[in-house]
Amino acid sequence: MARNANITRETKETKIEVFLDIDRKGEIKVSTPVPFFNHMLITLLTYMNSTATVSATDKLPYDDHHIIEDVAITLGLAIKEALGDKRGIKRFSHQIIPMDEALVLVSLDISNRGIAFVNLNLKRSEIGGLATENIPHFFQSFAYNSGVTLHISQLSGYNTHHIIEASFKALGLALYEATRIVDNEIRSTKGVI
């Protein structure tokens, strides 16, 4: 069974289109109006070993909030759809990733209980067109819509770029590991995720 999804989400504020194949490493295309966000999405999808296209149009281009939130929602929905009933997935993963002085831990459970706990000390208010207050919001919106319980904690570091990038790398690696098929069972004592 192919584990992929094609999701379009259009509101009065944005139009987001996401194609995601979590089993096939291939081309990654990302186009949003926020340059640093493009870099982070490419990083996330690369470390997931996926094939992906993300296209985001901002209909009300007065700040980056709607784009960040709506891409997170749509990408989360794409992962949830691609995983189907989650049969056979490893389900859990954690990664501790350095980027120079920064060290970030990501731990997740594909539990169908989407929530995020984000502890990042981002000292710069903006980087590459992205308000750093939207980084935790991205992770929260993504977790809620993907059904992932997500913990992200900064263990060390002071460079905002490094801290954010280590977070996206760690999330990508953790998602890759947690979505791998390890058997034919539903990994839950309830028999359903």
Swiss-Prot record:
Pathway per the UniProt entry: Amino-acid biosynthesis; L-histidine biosynthesis; L-histidine from 5-phospho-alpha-D-ribose 1-diphosphate: step 6/9
MF annotations from Gene Ontology: imidazoleglycerol-phosphate dehydratase activity
Tagged with keyword Cytoplasm: yes
Record InterPro entries: IGPD_sf, ImidazoleglycerolP_deHydtase, ImidazoleglycerP_deHydtase_CS, Ribosomal_Su5_D2-typ_SF
Any GO BP: L-histidine biosynthetic process
Entry protein name: Imidazoleglycerol-phosphate dehydratase
Organism: Saccharolobus islandicus (strain M.14.25 / Kamchatka #1) (Sulfolobus islandicus)
Keyword Cytoplasm: yes
UniProt-listed Pfam families: IGPD (PF00475)
Superkingdom of origin: Archaea
Catalytic activity line of the entry: D-erythro-1-(imidazol-4-yl)glycerol 3-phosphate = 3-(imidazol-4-yl)-2-oxopropyl phosphate + H2O
Protein location: Cytoplasm
Keyword terms, alphabetized: Amino-acid biosynthesis, Cytoplasm, Histidine biosynthesis, Lyase
Enzyme Commission identifier(s): 4.2.1.19
GO CC, alphabetical: cytoplasm
The family this protein is said to belong to: Belongs to the imidazoleglycerol-phosphate dehydratase family.
